[in-house]
From Swiss-Prot:
Subcellular localization(s) per the UniProt record: Cytoplasm; Nucleus
Record InterPro entries: Nucleotide-bd_a/b_plait_sf, RBD_domain_sf, RBM45_RRM1, RBM45_RRM2, RBM45_RRM3, RBM45_RRM4, RRM_dom, SLIRP/GR-RBP-like
Residues in RRM domain copies: 26-106, 121-195, 392-464
Gene Ontology cellular component list: cytoplasm; nucleoplasm; nucleus; ribonucleoprotein complex
Protein's job: RNA-binding protein with binding specificity for poly(C). May play an important role in neural development.
Principal subcellular localization: cytoplasm
Organism: Homo sapiens (Human)
Gene Ontology MF term list: identical protein binding; RNA binding
Keyword Ubl conjugation set for record: yes
SMART domains: RRM (SM00360)
Modified-residue entries (Phosphoserine), positions: 199, 464
Protein name: RNA-binding protein 45
Covalent link location (Glycyl lysine isopeptide (Lys-Gly) (interchain with G-Cter in SUMO2)): 34
Keyword annotations: Cytoplasm, Developmental protein, Differentiation, Isopeptide bond, Neurogenesis, Nucleus, Phosphoprotein, Repeat, RNA-binding, Ubl conjugation
Length: 476
């Protein structure tokens, strides 16, 4: 994808490639009509702050707009406020299609997924050891509505370590706090919750001088770790991050790109491999992949067996767990069952007819799909007849992979009046059809941005079939 962009006359400073993400999270990514001119973008987004540049992505050969653009602001808070207020809005009276606005991923981050709102609302600060949570709240409430504050304490003595977290309701509020709070707080955007606390503190102290100068925090070597962070519970307050998150899913990173077949052949050594997927990074030559096993025991064995494995010779691959929101404290209690499951997986490995009926929890009959999530879901409801007229269609995006169809149906039928839910072959997207708009809106309100079975969902209203047929095929 080639980016062709220009600054309108009088646009002022245009940042170089090295400063596109300076300060961090100051660039927004837009999905717009391919007929929207740059002048309209500048007019609609300039009220939010100082626009340094606008890029419109164009076709390499025809030079036509692809309906994608980037807007670079001078400050992160300006970009965040633009995202909050313009996402889902229409740009003009003749443009009735709502636009989509996201914070653009850093070009050097090693990841090409969207930056989620939850990742932009929590800040990490250095505070006096005498501070209470109420003191922390009092200092930072001037920048916006605070969801919670927490102070990191010594597990043995219970004394404050002089570090804390503040989570705001909006990304723009967190950005305002970082930009405007007293420099002695050394405020930075917090790392994902599943990163070990000792590592977070070491990163914080080693990069304090860099952060004070406004540089971006160090990028995680394993970009997929932490994508599926759960909603806030008691995670920060009990300071339980010292233990590595363990799950059935693994992130694989290599300095040398690999194909899906190569990835499969490496991890198929361990029985119980469910699927593997290669992630393409347009900004580097690194290889990224996600591997999932049917059970935790197989994933643990694969992680410790293959982390550091040389493939090809001289190139060590990095393997780490991806937090799927499961509770690691239950691991020992469940390990015996999981080990038996791993043995069963090995026994039926060469018998596909048994594999398709095998349930790796010990049962082999038909079972309702199990849903693991912090989301409060309604009870199951009957589906609407297949011939029922469709009142609303929902577009579903999965990260990093689609959920099984039976799980999807179980989730989306709970809102009532579901006609059908289906996946698009070869894509991480799907659709749900409802016979009632209220049911569809309830599904969006409950599920958008949430994590179910380790998969983050984006649920939004789909374009009408007529509109979709006139558009170029999207890539995700």
């Amino acid at each position: 994808m080639d980016e062709a962009g220009s600054s309108a006359s009088g646009g002022g400073f245009r940042p170089g490639v090295d400063s596109l993400d300076e300060p961090p999270n100051s660039r927004i990514f837009l999905v717009i009509s391919k007929y929207t001119p740059e002048s309209v973008l500048r007019e609609r987004f300039s009220p939010f702050g100082d626009i340094q540049d606008i890029w419109v992505v164009r076709d390499k050969h025809t030079k036509e707009s692809k309906g994608i653009a980037f807007v670079k602001f001078a400050r992160s808070s300006q970009a965040c406020r633009a995202m909050e207020e313009m996402h889902g809005q229409c740009l003009g009276p003749n443009d009735t299609k709502p636009i989509k606005v996201f914070i653009a991923q850093s070009r050097s981050s090693g990841s090409h997924r969207d930056v989620e709102d939850e990742e932009l609302t929590r800040i990490f600060v250095m505070i006096p050891k005498s501070y209470t949570e109420e003191d922390l709240r009092e200092k930072f409430k001037v920048y916006g509505d605070i969801e919670y504050c927490s102070i990191i304490k010594n597990k043995v003595t219970g004394e404050s370590k002089g570090l804390g977290y503040v989570r705001y309701l909006k990304p723009s509020q967190a950005a305002q706090a970082i930009e405007n709070c007293d420099r002695s707080f050394r405020a930075i955007l917090a790392e994902p919750k599943n990163k070990a606390s000792e590592s977070s503190e070491q990163d914080y102290y080693s990069n304090m001088r860099q952060e004070a100068l406004g540089h971006e925090p160090r990028v995680n070597m394993f970009p997929f770790v932490g994508e599926q962070q759960s909603e806030f519970s008691s995670f920060d307050k009990n300071d339980s991050r010292g233990q590595e998150a363990i799950s059935k899913r693994l992130s694989v990173v290599s300095r040398v790109p690999f194909t899906e077949e190569q990835l499969f052949s490496i991890f198929d050594i361990v029985p119980g491999l469910e699927y593997c997927e290669v992630q393409r990074d347009p900004y580097s030559n690194y290889g990224h992949g996600v591997v999932q096993y049917f059970n935790v025991a197989s994933a643990i064995y694969a992680k410790y067996k293959l982390h550091g494995f040389q493939y090809p010779p001289g190139n060590r691959i990095g393997v780490s767990f991806i937090d799927d929101g499961s509770n690691a404290t239950d691991l020992l209690r469940k390990m015996a069952t999981q080990m038996v499951a791993a043995q069963l997986a090995s026994m039926v490995w060469n018998n596909p007819s048994q594999q398709q009926f095998m349930q790796f929890g010990g049962s082999s009959g038909s079972q309702l799909p199990q849903i693991q999530t912090d989301v409060v879901l309604p009870s199951c409801k009957k589906k609407a007849p297949a011939e029922t007229p469709v009142k609303e269609r929902l577009f579903i995006v999965f990260n990093p992979h689609p959920l099984p169809l039976d799980v999807l149906e179980d989730i989306f039928c709970r809102f009532g009046n579901l006609i059908e839910v289906y996946l698009v072959s070869g894509k991480n997207v799907g659709y749900a059809k409802y016979a009632d708009r209220i049911s569809a809106n309830d599904a969006i309100a409950t599920l958008h941005g949430k994590i179910l079975n380790g998969v983050r969902l984006k649920v939004m209203l789909a374009d009408s079939p007529r509109e979709e047929s006139n558009k170029r095929q999207r890539t995700y």
